[in-house]
């Protein structure tokens, strides 16, 4: 009798007719390969990884190494518009980006005087990482505005009577997520205030007319309108040094984005490796259930091992505690059931109790039917 080995699930056996020795004899069978054999090669790689857990761990470690912010920062590029370099303070920004360690590209941008961030995925990209980790997502754009240019847009914006998504400085065709930055607006408004009092002559009648019509209350109103209507952030900085710190902070945040995306894509991103993730072993005879119950109590915030031991000693299982809660006649009695349980004091310490806060949280945990209920009022 012929044996069909592993991977021959789609193999069929057929005879070729009658044998030489007569109609009762059968010739050796022939094998015909079905379409399912083509799937063997596709699944062989996954099977090889399953048989080699060490190789799978190495691949996961390499993928996590590529997700480290310092590694992502090397593949991050800040595209700076050429018009920004015409400003005398642009050297401060360029030196800060160079010290950060990311790539800096000087190339024309639209709109002018803007910065963009681009991130390149590693080549080759590890297969163990979800594709959304390296998705480019929404591109960030930071537009630098001169104070007078910003104030002219504010004067236009404050004349609009209703909600609008239109922004004076940014084209509607822009696909990136825009942010605005204005350098020296406070000092500029202060100087314009002295100009209006006649202390010095304005440089341009057009600019002076625009500036006299806009005051700080109108600027603050425009900032609120931009945030509520257009979801647009406006950064007001006093110097190029402050702007450089902000640009570096945004660059570092974008370098941390892939690792955060990877952690959020995991089933339980809050679990860490080691004993905590492994849990408590529970045997078929019930050995270990009390330790698992003690660990569950420890998962509540601000619960020490001594407090957890006090609860588990009084109620060795959650079912016993639930029955005790159901036996309470009033809600107040139910909430304070565990409050007066004594906690063994440490060396030289004073006697303690479980307290009403933890008693209330454990009671709600075992009795509520609302999955969105916030147990910890202090969080």
UniProtKB/Swiss-Prot annotation:
Changing residue 295 to E: No effect on cleavage of 3 prime flaps, nHJs and 5 prime flaps. Part of the heterodimeric MUS81-EME2 complex; the complex forms specifically during the DNA replication phase of the cell cycle. This is Structure-specific endonuclease subunit EME2. GO terms for cellular component: endodeoxyribonuclease complex; Holliday junction resolvase complex; nuclear chromosome; nuclear replication fork. One of its GO terms (biological process) is mitotic intra-S DNA damage checkpoint signaling. The keyword Transmembrane helix does not apply. Belongs to the EME1/MMS4 family. PANTHER family: CROSSOVER JUNCTION ENDONUCLEASE EME2-RELATED (PTHR21077:SF6), EME1 PROTEIN (PTHR21077). Keywords: DNA damage, DNA recombination, DNA repair, Nucleus. Non-catalytic subunit of the structure-specific, heterodimeric DNA endonuclease MUS81-EME2 which is involved in the maintenance of genome stability. In the complex, EME2 is required for DNA cleavage, participating in DNA recognition and bending. MUS81-EME2 cleaves 3'-flaps and nicked Holliday junctions, and exhibit limited endonuclease activity with 5' flaps and nicked double-stranded DNAs. MUS81-EME2 which is active during the replication of DNA is more specifically involved in replication fork processing. It is found in: Nucleus. Residues 1-55 are annotated as: Disordered. It comes from Homo sapiens. Residues 50-266 are annotated as: Nuclease-like domain. CDD domains: XPF_nuclease_EME2. Changing residue 353 to E: Decreased cleavage of 3 prime flaps, nHJs and 5 prime flaps. Residues 288-379 are annotated as: Helix-hairpin-helix (2HhH). GO terms for molecular function: DNA binding; endonuclease activity.
């Amino acid at each position: 009798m012929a044996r069909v080995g592993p991977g021959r699930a789609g193999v069929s056996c057929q005879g070729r007719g009658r044998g030489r020795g007569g109609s009762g004899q059968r010739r050796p069978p022939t094998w015909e390969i079905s379409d399912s054999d083509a799937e063997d090669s596709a699944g062989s790689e996954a099977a090889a990884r399953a048989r080699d857990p060490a190789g799978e761990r190495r691949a996961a470690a390499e993928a996590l190494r590529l997700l480290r912010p310092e590694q992502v920062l090397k593949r991050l590029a800040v595209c700076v518009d050429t018009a920004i370099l015409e400003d005398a303070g642009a050297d401060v920004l360029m030196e800060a980006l160079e010290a950060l360690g990311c790539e800096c590209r000087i190339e024309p941008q639209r709109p002018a005087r803007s910065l963009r961030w681009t991130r390149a995925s590693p080549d080759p990209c590890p297969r163990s990482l979800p594709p959304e980790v390296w998705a480019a997502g929404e591109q960030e754009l930071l537009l630098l505005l001169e104070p007078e240019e910003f104030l002219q847009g504010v004067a236009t914006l404050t004349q609009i009577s209703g909600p609008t998504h239109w922004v004076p400085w940014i084209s509607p065709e822009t696909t990136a997520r825009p942010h605005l930055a204005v350098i020296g607006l406070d000092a500029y408004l202060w100087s314009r205030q002295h100009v209006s009092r006649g202390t010095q002559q304005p440089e341009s009648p057009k600019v002076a007319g625009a500036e006299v019509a806009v005051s700080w209350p109108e600027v603050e109103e425009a900032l609120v309108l931009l945030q509520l209507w257009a979801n647009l952030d406006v950064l007001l900085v006093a110097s190029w040094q402050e702007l450089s710190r902000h640009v570096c902070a945004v660059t570092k945040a974008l370098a941390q984005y892939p690792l955060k995306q990877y952690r959020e894509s995991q089933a339980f991103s809050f679990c860490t490796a080691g004993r905590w993730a492994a849990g408590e072993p529970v045997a078929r005879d019930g050995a270990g259930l009390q330790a698992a119950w003690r660990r569950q109590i420890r998962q509540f915030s601000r619960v020490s091992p001594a407090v957890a031991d006090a609860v588990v000693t009084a109620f060795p299982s959650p079912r016993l505690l639930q029955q005790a809660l159901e036996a309470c006649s009033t809600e107040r009695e139910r909430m304070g059931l565990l409050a007066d349980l004594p906690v063994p004091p440490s060396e030289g310490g004073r006697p303690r109790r479980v307290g009403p806060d933890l008693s209330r949280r454990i009671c709600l945990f075992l009795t509520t039917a609302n999955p969105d209920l916030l147990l910890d009022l202090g969080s």
